[in-house]
Amino acid sequence: MRFHLGLTEALQEREPNINASSKDLSLLHFELYRRSEPIMDIDEESYLNAGPSAPSKIPQGGEGDGLQGMSKKAMKRAAKQARLEEIKPLKRAAERERRRQRTAQLAEGYAAGTLSEADKELVERRRRVEKERKEAQRRIESGDQANDWLGGVVIDLGFDDLMTDQEIASMAQQLGYLYSSNRTAEKPVRTVIHTTFSPAASPRLWQRMENFNWHKWSRCHWWEQGLETLKSQLDPSTSILSVQSVVSKETQDKAGIDTKSLLSRLTGPQVPVDLQAGKHKLVYLSADAEDELLSLSEDEIYIIGGIVDRNRHKNLCQGKAEQLGIRTARLPIGTFLEMLPTRKALTVNQVFDILVKYLHLGDWAAAFEAVIPIRKYAPGRKAKRAKTETKRNEKVEEEVECTSAEGEEDIGVIEESAEVDPEDVFSNQ
């Protein structure tokens, strides 16, 4: 049986007379949830004993209706998830306040000249980024896009059903980081198309993105239609020169009042004016491709697979591209990936960052180093991380041995939310 170490210690401090049996700790874990802010009006005995073999004392109506017929383990899992959802806004507010205080401390220390070299570098880097952001916004508002790269990038979001909820949350964040990178890039990509994006096509991602003000993102286009539609639109033999944006009836039926206003921001299948049928060719970036991408051309549109899957699905993007008859290519960074001891798969925003850095620097090695500095993966750092991880695992194993008992169910580890809310990334600019 696994326990969140900090939570167990906090419980035993609050109730010093309890023994460390699994039953007592199970009750106290639930008690901490209930006392801090009740999820539902259920006493501990009803909560732990409810099930097919015992009459349920769970209140009828409201949230209790959804718990009827659930096993004890499923009820615990649902209660934990509900509690995490309740405290998420509080955690976000606390994190914002912590960042605000940290920023104020850094500014004060920088002015007084008392910061360490690392903190001083952090402050200066943040100021450079903010300056670049304001300059990029000024260029957009003034219509000055002369430095834009006239090719295109497509984020293929047609994998909603292959990701977990946590991976969907990570995907939404990566899209935010990608937009921020393009907004502040020295040579931004003029056209970024997101395909398969709507309440019907990608319901969970759509819900996540509602808080990101995606409809205000500059240089971004959002399509409900998939990659196959874009391919046909760019084919001069099948493309329609003048086409109105179309939202499917299924999507309209699912839309609420607020959602319908967002649906008007979907522009597919209208190809952006900077992309021309017969001129621009699609290239799907895939680590499994045989061809290596030697340079970037403004006559090509590069597709990045919008999926977070921890390498579960092998050859997914390669297979999809082959099925659609789209050329594939891999970034010429295999040598650099081999130098990474712990990470082989790049995130969507990292792939995009490498592209825009290459557009500015004209060198793949420099672009990769700018996005993922190799110095962070020096042998010394690797050994130190391994040692820290070993100690952490040993501590967890000791806790498990002290608290586990036969016949008890696994309470599970309370996981921190993977969400981050950097205001400079997800602003309305």
UniProtKB/Swiss-Prot annotation:
Which sites bind S-adenosyl-L-methionine? Answer: 285-286, 305, 309-313, 317, 331, 344-346
Which residue ranges does the record assign to the SAM-dependent MTase TRM10-type domain?
A: 131-379
Q: Which organism is it from?
A: Cryptococcus neoformans var. neoformans serotype D (strain B-3501A)
Provide the protein name.
tRNA (guanine(9)-N1)-methyltransferase
What this protein is reported to do is described as: S-adenosyl-L-methionine-dependent guanine N(1)-methyltransferase that catalyzes the formation of N(1)-methylguanine at position 9 (m1G9) in cytoplasmic tRNA.
Q: Name one GO molecular function term.
A: tRNA binding
Q: Indicate, by first and last residue, each region the UniProt record lists as having compositional bias (Acidic residues).
A: 396-429
Reactions that this protein is recorded to catalyse: guanosine(9) in tRNA + S-adenosyl-L-methionine = N(1)-methylguanosine(9) in tRNA + S-adenosyl-L-homocysteine + H(+)
- InterPro entries to which the protein is assigned, alphabetical: MT_TRM10-typ, MT_TRM10-typ_sf, tRNA_m1G_MeTrfase_euk, tRNA_MeTrfase_TRMD/TRM10
Q: Which GO terms describe its cellular component?
A: cytoplasm; nucleus
